[in-house]
Every structure is written in structure tokens, then in C-alpha cells.
């Protein structure tokens, strides 16, 4: 019996959209501009789906269209697509200009935030010379191990194995439930099952 629990995590909702409308919502690589008014089409198509609410859909759609990956895809020559991936409209220049400006502002904010969080070097003070003091040796701090996720190979995967699925910029944890040739079925921790290729799985 399929779970009817509502999805509340935005990443899980995006994963659901990637699975349900793969020709419209692109999980990896270059995206395509979405049709104007697509939210209404999306709400109507999922009207009987108890997993998602209109509010959560709107939040997920806003995150998708605000991502750097999406904004880079709003460019000259690109065409808008509908839920089924059909081209339906030309991009207007003002929308391209707006995407370029929004991308630059977002990148500038991210750069400023990184600089603000970076440790600042204190100004050097000229102190009077004193007799050298005996320094007490302090143990060097032990750095926390860095866990680096790497793409999996099909032969390394097995059922019931804990993995991370690469969906957009954020890996989503889940468990391998089935392996069929080159396709791997993974049940995400949100309860959603998604079929991906081995190279989209991180270990």
C-alpha cells in the first residue's frame, strides 16, 4: 500500500518532482526555462496527490527556479517547456536579463557571506621586548575526519545498503531496495522510491 504521508522537506518534494516530471524538472546538468504559469498546471496535475500541498509545491518550485543551475539555463536560444518537456514559448529578452542580474546578485551575496565567515587576521601590535617566556606545548587539535562522498559503481551496490542519491546540489540519504541491470531503485528516508543510475549514487 502506497504511503499517503505528506512530504514536508523541500529536497524530498524536489526529488518527487524529478521522478514524476523528469522531462520538465531536470535533476542534474543543464535545466530548461519553465513555462509561465507552470505552477497552476502543476497544482492541477497533482490535485489528487495527497503527498504534496500547494504551499510546499510553491516553495519547491521557487527553490528550483532560484538555483544557479536554473538561472544559467535562462539564456538566449533557450525555450520554455511545459510539464511534459514540450517547448511552448520563446524566452523574452527581459527575462534573460532578469535571470543574469539575479544570478549575479545571488553569487555576490554568497561570496560576501563566505568572506564574512572567514576568520579575520588580528592587526599586529608592536609590544615592548620582554625576556623570552617558557612556552607550554599544547597538543595539536585533532581535525574531525572529512567524509567525502564518491560516485558508486554498480558492482559495489547491494540491496539494503545505505547510500546517498545525488539530486541537485544536496545528496539525499536512502536505502537500495532493488538493482535491475543499470538501474538502481532507492527508497529515500522521506519514504519516496526513486530509480536512478549507479553514477547518481554516492558512497
Curated annotation (Swiss-Prot):
It is found in: Cytoplasm. Residues 111-138 are annotated as: Disordered. Keywords: Chaperone, Cytoplasm, RNA-binding. GO terms for biological process: post-transcriptional regulation of gene expression. The keyword Methyltransferase does not apply. HAMAP family: ProQ (MF_00749). This is RNA chaperone ProQ. It comes from Shewanella frigidimarina (strain NCIMB 400). The gene is proQ.
